Amino acid sequence: MKYELTAREARVIGCLLEKQVTTPEQYPLSLNGVVTACNQKTNREPVMNLSEQEVQTELDNLVKRHFLRTVSGFGNRVTKYEQRFCNSEFGDLKLSPAEVALITTLLLRGAQTPGELRSRAARMYEFSDMSEVDSTLEKLAQREDGPFVVRLAREPGKRESRYMHLFCGEVDDTASFAEETPPVAGELQARVEALENEVAELKQRLDSLLAHLGD
């Protein structure tokens, strides 16, 4: 696939896509901002602990591949990065806000059920109902320039199948899945995580505001 990424590249792009929507006042992101976003404890699976040098290497690679671009100049004391992975002026990949929300959540969290995706993507896009989630996933799975997601085989006893993005290559549909919580508990956990993410982002905004006032 034209857009095939490594796991670390997927994390970096997912973070930039997320912050572009959820904290636009802090976007584009500096190197430090990207490191912080990549290593977040909430809304990340797996949790990573990348160094500045490791993140810088990924940023440089993505700039060379034209998936990111640097932003510098008047008023910018440090180099910042913005994504050109999708919906950029000269890029080919065009996604709707709903598609961006689902792709971003899959890049950051891996395989998830439609119910989990709806809860976890709510900060980026508010789906009207589960039918909209399902139809958006179906479109991503059937796009002519894709497919970009795949529906995984449902495990025995599970109510919903999980979906996974294909930006890191084909997914082994027969691979054994990690143990999952029951559907109701899983949905509750997703809602708790969404609230934790909101609190974390509010704290991040407050810290940024206090730092700005202190300058």
Swiss-Prot record:
The chain residues annotated with the modification N6-acetyllysine are K80
InterPro entries assigned to the protein according to its UniProt record, in alphabetical order = DUF480, WH-like_DNA-bd_sf, WH_DNA-bd_sf
Query: One Pfam family of this protein, by short name?
Result: DUF480
Q: Which top-level group of life is the source organism from?
A: Bacteria
| Record key words, sorted | Acetylation
Protein family membership: Belongs to the UPF0502 family.
What is the protein named? UPF0502 protein YceH
Q: Which organism is it from?
A: Escherichia fergusonii (strain ATCC 35469 / DSM 13698 / CCUG 18766 / IAM 14443 / JCM 21226 / LMG 7866 / NBRC 102419 / NCTC 12128 / CDC 0568-73)
Lineage, uppermost ranks? Bacteria, Pseudomonadati, Pseudomonadota, Gammaproteobacteria, Enterobacterales
